Structure formats: structure tokens, C-alpha cells
């Protein structure tokens, strides 16, 4: 018979997603009986004279005195869960036997050298937790990023109804490919702390290895799979981080450096790497929870600075709009929303998603990729490569020899290319327009610098009062020197453009020659 607690236990069916179900303790959770948020009371049990129930398990039912530091750390761990789920924790005072969650402070002898145990909802001794101060180096919870803090968040996950991804606790399925509790990260490497704090492989284990002794560099929040699971049970905290928030990438390996999963309920938000002293990777895509679609991205995409044992992933359904890179060589990736992506100094690669993005490379030789959407791509100083892809994009090369590139990977289609504006084409700076033969399939020009004379023509006249579109020319690339329009004339002298058409306008209407192009195989 389960221990009596303030709240009743309810149960939800499994979701059908093994990466959520694998960390659900059979779907059991503490029910609020319709009130919102779910209010869960807790008590620090620190009196050896308290008459706590002796009937649950083989572990100590007396507790050592909790220190203020230990209490504060556990409260921070509770707050980490309350930040993401529709839960409100209430401290009802020390030594309250009836509290839903009762927290023991024990030692190695009392806990057989185990770091922590928490009985999940619906089990004998439900809500009773044991934290081993000795096994955790003298502090029961420690600082964020330490193994002690990981244990605190992990055990509180059990307290709320979560299970391990490596075993069948509560009837949960094991994560695909996981063969043991330690060291086995399973298919796609998803059994590790960067994706779920319920794993026994803390931190970014597959990249950084075992860092349990550092005192930093592990996860400090529930991670993407944990957040999805706990929100399935209790609902979302839609009041957390509703303003315009900035998340700064950790830039130093020190106490407090950690990985965290961003749960943000609103506002226009930014991941900022400007303080980093090395290359950064920033990816604004959220954890999809779908391995078939996104592989390991189901558990989130890691944003971090090179050599630093900390960073961010983004929880499912969270929108982070903007990214700011460092002054080194960064990789910045946008999402499906309207992003403002800034590279700053360094030779950066910046790629937008499906939204209408503004992408600014800053100083350095950058590669800017717009993808779907009507994007604004700004090279800044340096020799940049600018790729718009689909959408009607605006290209601003800035100072330096820039390449405005067109290569969709397939034959030219207007929807794939759009009608772009090249704002500042400057031959004297070495600017070029690069055309791929895999896209501009009618070109006869050999790969290399310059179009063949037969492939390029300049139009200066009107036909029947409309701009000459190249319908009467054999050239495949036709430039209208009156208005800066640049056409792909796939059909040559035949009527119409075939699948081609206007693909760019050089708004400064420069002089253009066949030598201003590069042909790519």
C-alpha cells in the first residue's frame, strides 16, 4: 500500500513516443484534482527524533540535519522543474511527515553508497527521497553543472513521475539501442544528459566524456525529453520567461558552467555568443521529439562555444528568434520563424530557415545562406559568398570581393530561386555572380571564370513598349542594362523563357559583362 500523501496519484496513458514514454513512470503523477497549477508540498526531514514511517524499503528513516546550503540547492532544483511545468512547490516546514515530498539527508552507510533515491508516485514510500551528502562530496545538491546538482534534479524527476531511459522502471520502455545504465547512449546517442537528465550519462557525454569530478560542465535543468514528459503529466508553465530574454553562451569553464534546455514562453529572444573566446555554434531549432524526421535533433540542437563544457538546447515548441555570434569563426543556424542572425567578426557560416530573415555576416569572409523566405543578407567587410535560395531576397555584399551564388541543386524553377535584388554589385571590388550548371542547365559555358560569349547578352531596347526580356536572343543569360534586370533565358530564341525568367535585379544598374560570372559545375 502506498504511503498516504497530501495529493492523490493519477495515471495517464503512454504517448506512443518511446523517447517520452521511456522516462515516464507508467504515466503516474500527482493529481491536483482540477486545480491549476498542481500544488505539491515538501518538507526537509532533518530530525533524528521524528517518528517517520519505518515500513518503506530498507533505507534509513532518520535524517541528518539539513544545512542552509543544502536546502537552498534543493530549492533551486525544485525551481528548475517548476519553471517548465504547471507545478507550484510549497515548503510546509521541516519534519512534516504528511508532506507529499519528504527529503532525507543521509550518508553512505545509510544509502549503501548510492547517490540518491526517490520513490515515484504510486509506489510504496511514494514521495520519500534520500539524498546522500557523503557520496556527493559533502553538499547534498551542489551548484548548477555539478554532479550533485544533476542528482538533485534527477531524483526530483523520479519524485514527480519520471523513470530511467535505461530500464523498465514503472513499466517504461528502454530507449532504443541502450544496453546498460552507464556508457551506453543508444541509437542516435540520445541516452545522455544533454537530452534527458534521467540518464546515467550526465552532460554532453558523447562529446566530452565522463566529467563527473569537475564540479561543472554537466546539465543544470530538465532537458528536452524531460520537459516534454513532465509537461505531458502536469502541463506547461506558460508564465515563465514571457519577456524579451537573452541567453548568453557560457564562455569560461568554471563553477556554474553547465548545459541547460531553454524553456521560454514568449517574447523576442536571443542566444548571444559575443563573450566567447572561441568559435561558437548557435542553432535556433527546437527539439522536435521526432527521430524519424530529425535524428538526434529530436532531443535538441546544442549551442555552445568550442572547448566550453556548457551551452543550450531549446525545448520543443519554444521559439528563439535571434542569434549573435562571437568574433571568431561561427556557425549560426536559424529556424522557421523570422530571425535576425549576426555573425560579428570572423569567417562565419550563417544559414536562415523558412522565415523572412535578416542575416548579417559582419567582418570576415562569410558564407550567408537564406533558404526559404524573403531574406535580407548583408555580407559586411570581407570576401563573402551569399546564397538566397527560394524567396525574393535582398543581397548587400559590402566591402570586399563577394560572390552572389545561385545553386539550388536541381534544374531552375522560379519557386526555388525567387527574384532577388543585388544592391551593390561592384566589379572593381571583384564581385561575381556564380551560376551552377546543375541549376542553369541550358548553359553551354564550361565551368570556370566567365560565361561563354554565346551564353551572355545585354539588352538595351524595348519591344512593343515592354522591357526586352530576351525572347528574341539566343543567349541564356540576358542583362537589361536599362534597369538592372537579369534573366535566365532557357529557351534561347524560342518564345518565352521556358522554366527560366527574371531571377535577379542589380539595383545599382552596373555595367555587366560575361567576365563578371563564375560557372560552377
Q: What does each model-identified segment do?
A:
Residues 53-95, 266, 272-277:
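Zn2+-dependent metallopeptidase catalytic core
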Residues 221, 305-309, 317, 321, ...:
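Low-complexity acidic/polar repeat-biased segments
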Residues 62, 138-142, 146-147, 170-184, ...:
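Acidic, glycine-rich calcium-binding repeat modules characteristic of RTX/beta-roll
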Amino acid at each position: 500500500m502506498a504511503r498516504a500523501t497530501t495529493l492523490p496519484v493519477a495515471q495517464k496513458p503512454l504517448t506512443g513516443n518511446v523517447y517520452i514514454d521511456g522516462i515516464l513512470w507508467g504515466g503516474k503523477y500527482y493529481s491536483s484534482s482540477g486545480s491549476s497549477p498542481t500544488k505539491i508540498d515538501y518538507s526537509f526531514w532533518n530530525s533524528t527524533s521524528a517518528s517517520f514511517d519505518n515500513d518503506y524499503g530498507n533505507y534509513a528513516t532518520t535524517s541528518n540535519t539539513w544545512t542552509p546550503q543544502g536546502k537552498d540547492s534543493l530549492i533551486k532544483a525544485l525551481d528548475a522543474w517548476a519553471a517548465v511545468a504547471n507545478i507550484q512547490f510549497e515548503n510546509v516546514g521541516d519534519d512534516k511527515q504528511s508532506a507529499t515530498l519528504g527529503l532525507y539527508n543521509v550518508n553512505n552507510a545509510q544509502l549503501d553508497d548510492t547517490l540518491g533515491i526517490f520513490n515515484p508516485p504510486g509506489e510504496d514510500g511514494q514521495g520519500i527521497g534520500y539524498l546522500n551528502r557523503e557520496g556527493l562530496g559533502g553538499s547534498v545538491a551542489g551548484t548548477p553543472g555539478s554532479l550533485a546538482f544533476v542528482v538533485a534534479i534527477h531524483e526530483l524527476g523520479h519524485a514527480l513521475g519520471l523513470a530511467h531511459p535505461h530500464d523498465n522502471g514503472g513499466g517504461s520502455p528502454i530507449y532504443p539501442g541502450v544496453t546498460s545504465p552507464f556508457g551506453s547512449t543508444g541509437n542516435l546517442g540520445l541516452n545522455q544528459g544533454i537530452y534527458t537528465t534521467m540518464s546515467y550519462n550526465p552532460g554532453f557525454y558523447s562529446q566530452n566524456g565522463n566529467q563527473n569530478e569537475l564540479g561543472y560542465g554537466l546539465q543544470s535543468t530538465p532537458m528536452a525529453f524531460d520537459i516534454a514528459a513532465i509537461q505531458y503529466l502536469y502541463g506547461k508553465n506558460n508564465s515563465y520567461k514571457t519577456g524579451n530574454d537573452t541567453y548568453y553562451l557560457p564562455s569560461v569553464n568554471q563553477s556554474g558552467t553547465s548545459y541547460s534546455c531553454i524553456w521560454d514562453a514568449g517574447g523576442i529572444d536571443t542566444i548571444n555568443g559575443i563573450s566567447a573566446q572561441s568559435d561558437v555554434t548557435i542553432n535556433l531549432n527546437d527539439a522536435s521529439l521526432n527521430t524519424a524526421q530529425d535524428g538526434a535533433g529530436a532531443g535538441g540542437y546544442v549551442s555552445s562555444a568550442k572547448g566550453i563544457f556548457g551551452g543550450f538546447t531549446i525545448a520543443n515548441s519554444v521559439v528563439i528568434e535571434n542569434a549573435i555570434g562571437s568574433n571568431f569563426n561561427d556557425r549560426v543556424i536559424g529556424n522557421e520563424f523570422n530571425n535576425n542572425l549576426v555573425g560579428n567578426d570572423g569567417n562565419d557560416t550563417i544559414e536562415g530557415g523558412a522565415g523572412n530573415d535578416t542575416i548579417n555576416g559582419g567582418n570576415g569572409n562569410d558564407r550567408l545562406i537564406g533558404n526559404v523566405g524573403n531574406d535580407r543578407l548583408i555580407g559586411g567587410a570581407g570576401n563573402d559568398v551569399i546564397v538566397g535560395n527560394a524567396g525574393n531576397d535582398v543581397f548587400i555584399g559590402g566591402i570586399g570581393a563577394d560572390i552572389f551564388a545561385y545553386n539550388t541543386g536541381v534544374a531552375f524553377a522560379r519557386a526555388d530561386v525567387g527574384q532577388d535584388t543585388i544592391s551593390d554589385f561592384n566589379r572593381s571590388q571583384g564581385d561575381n555572380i556564380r551560376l551552377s550548371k546543375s541549376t542553369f542547365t541550358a548553359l553551354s559555358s564550361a565551368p570556370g571564370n566567365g560565361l561563354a560569349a554565346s551564353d551572355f547578352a545585354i539588352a538595351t531596347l524595348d519591344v512593343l513598349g515592354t522591357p526586352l526580356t530576351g525572347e528574341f536572343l539566343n543567349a541564356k543569360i540576358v542583362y537589361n542594362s536599362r534597369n538592372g534586370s537579369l534573366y535566365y533565358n532557357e529557351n534561347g530564341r524560342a518564345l518565352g523563357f521556358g522554366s527560366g525568367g527574371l531571377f535577379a535585379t542589380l539595383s545599382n544598374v552596373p555595367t555587366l559583362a560575361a567576365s563578371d560570372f563564375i560557372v560552377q559545375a
